[in-house]
Each structure stands twice: as structure tokens, then as C-alpha cells.
């Protein structure tokens, strides 16, 4: 069912062939496309399940307190493979926030304010080069000029919300800490679900309640969709951020009983299990785990 759901679906996102970490004047680090990076339009749904597994495994590095250099490398590899998360359009109540006088924000991990002036909000994602944009009230004018590639990219997404189109431009950047936090949140959600069922019999009802509460906080604004008549009827998901797309794919995978998401007992890597009690991501990990186990048993016996 899971496989079929995404095989009959399409969506699109933009990734560049090169991203870099840059530090802004305020000392904050941002991920942004490189100066001469080339954009590529692709279908994230064709990347299931790897896009979700990769996102979760980046988060697991942080949950496992791995060295910062290892985490940073994994984050940059993910972004290069799949593109930025689209935080600018993921956080507000609507991705069409350019059509309103201000930006309205539901509760989130990154911005405390419930509403924000549009120019102030945009400055969070354009710390280096501004777009040629004029906004008066609900009216917005955006001039794209010079770079042919950027003009072509803008024309491709003319029917999309203006902010989504803007987030595909080279000038767009996302705060590194926010991106890292999002990966960590996804990994936390998975470990909460796995621990809840693993520890169910050994924890009391209060602890179970805390797990359920943590899980209930995971959710998102459902993406809209329409049907396109291609070579066969196809669901076209209108993801206005990659974040929302991953969140939806992750949700479906989390409840899939046929190929459950599991954590490897040996290396802590997230993998798709062929059955609900699968404990290892590979025969190699199973062997390693058993070798360590028998060694520690031997060591214990010798000490006695």
C-alpha cells in the first residue's frame, strides 16, 4: 500500500548541485546555494523511502551526540542530495503569506512571535543578498533580472505561491541551527514511537502518558493535492516545503505495518524492517552484535 501510494503520486522540489555554509554579520551560520550552483527540478516522492531514512539518520547522529563535524557533513550531504527544507514557507500559517499584510506563525521551535512584518520575516532567509522586491500592504512586486537560469526557474513556478518561488532562488538561505533542529525533531519522534512499544510492559501509565503526549505533538498542516491525467490518473501533491513533504512521507512510513521503521540494535541506524521485530539493519550488524555479546559474557565469567 505504502509503495503504491507514492508510485501513483508526483510532486516537485528544487535542489542545487552545490551548497555552502556561510556566516552572516550576526555570527549565525546559514546553508545557501553556491554562487554558480545549478538548480535541478526533481520529484521527491521518487526518493521514498531513502529521503526519509536519510533525514532520520542525520537526526540520530545528534541524538547519539556524535562529533559536530560528522553531523555537519551529514547535513550538508542531505541538503546537496535533496535541497533545502523550505522553512520559509513551512513555518507560516500559509505559504501564500506574500498576499497578506504580515506573516502569521503557529507555534514552532524557531520563532517565538505569533506574527511578524513581512520584510523582517524575509530577512531571516536572505541574510546575504536581498531579492529585488517591493511590498506595499498586500501588493508585492518582485523583479527577476540578469541570470537566465533564475528567470527560467521563476517562470517554471509562476503558478506557485510567490514565497515558494522565491525560496528556489540562489539568494535564499536557511539557518544551519534550524535545519539541524528539524532533523533532530524527526529522530526524536521515531525514537519516542519505538521506545513506547519496546518499553510498554516495563513502564507505568504516567510514563506511557508522557510518550503519548510527545507523539501527539508531531503533526503538520496537510498538503493540498489534485489529480492529473497523465499516462494514468496521478495524485499531484502540492508540497510548499520539502519539510512538509518529508513529514507526510515519514507519517505514512511510521504507521506502515508491512515495512516498519526500526532502529538497528548494533549501530543505531534507522532502517525499514521486513517484519515488526526486525532488530538489525544488516547480517553484518547482527554478527557484530552477537560477537560483542558473547565476548562480554566470557569476560564476565572470567572475572567470576
Where does each model-flagged region fall?
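Short helix-coil boundary/hinge micro-motifs
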Residues: 1-271
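BZIP DNA-binding basic region
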Residues: 246-304
Amino acid at each position: 500500500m505504502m509503495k503504491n501510494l507514492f508510485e501513483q503520486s508526483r510532486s516537485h522540489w528544487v535542489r542545487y548541485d552545490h551548497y555552502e555554509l556561510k556566516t552572516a554579520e550576526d555570527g549565525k551560520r546559514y546553508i545557501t546555494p553556491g554562487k554558480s550552483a545549478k538548480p535541478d527540478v526533481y520529484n521527491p516522492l521518487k526518493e521514498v523511502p531513502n529521503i526519509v531514512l536519510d533525514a532520520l539518520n542525520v537526526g540520530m547522529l545528534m541524538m547519539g551526540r556524535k562529533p559536530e563535524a560528522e553531523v555537519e557533513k551529514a547535513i550538508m550531504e542531505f541538503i546537496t542530495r535533496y535541497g533545502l527544507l523550505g522553512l520559509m514557507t513551512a513555518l507560516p500559517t500559509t505559504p501564500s503569506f506574500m498576499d497578506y499584510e504580515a506573516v502569521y506563525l503557529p507555534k514552532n521551535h524557531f520563532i517565538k512571535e505569533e506574527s511578524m512584518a513581512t520584510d523582517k520575516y524575509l530577512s531571516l532567509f536572505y541574510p546575504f543578498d536581498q531579492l529585488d522586491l517591493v511590498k506595499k500592504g498586500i501588493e508585492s512586486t518582485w523583479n527577476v533580472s540578469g541570470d537566465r537560469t533564475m528567470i527560467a526557474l521563476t517562470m517554471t513556478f509562476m503558478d506557485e505561491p510567490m514565497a515558494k518561488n522565491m525560496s528556489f532562488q540562489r539568494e535564499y538561505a536557511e539557518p544551519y541551527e534550524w535545519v539541524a533542529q528539524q532533523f533532530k525533531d524527526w529522530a526524536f519522534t521515531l525514537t519516542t514511537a519505538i521506545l513506547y512499544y519496546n518499553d510498554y510492559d516495563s513502564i507505568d501509565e504516567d510514563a506511557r502518558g508522557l510518550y503519548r503526549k510527545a507523539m501527539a505533538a508531531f503533526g503538520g498542516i496537510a498538503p493540498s493535492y489534485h489529480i492529473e491525467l497523465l499516462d494514468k490518473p496521478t495524485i499531484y501533491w502540492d508540497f510548499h516545503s520539502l519539510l512538509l513533504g518529508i513529514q507526510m512521507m515519514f507519517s505514512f512510513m511510521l504507521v506502515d505495518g508491512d515495512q516498519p521503521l526500526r532502529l538497528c540494535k548494533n549501530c543505531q541506524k534507522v532502517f525499514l524492517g521486513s517484519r515488526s521485530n526486525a532488530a538489525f539493519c544488516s547480517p553484518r550488524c547482527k554478527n557484530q552484535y552477537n560477537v560483542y555479546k558473547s565476548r562480554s559474557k566470557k569476560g564476565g565469567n572470567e572475572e567470576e
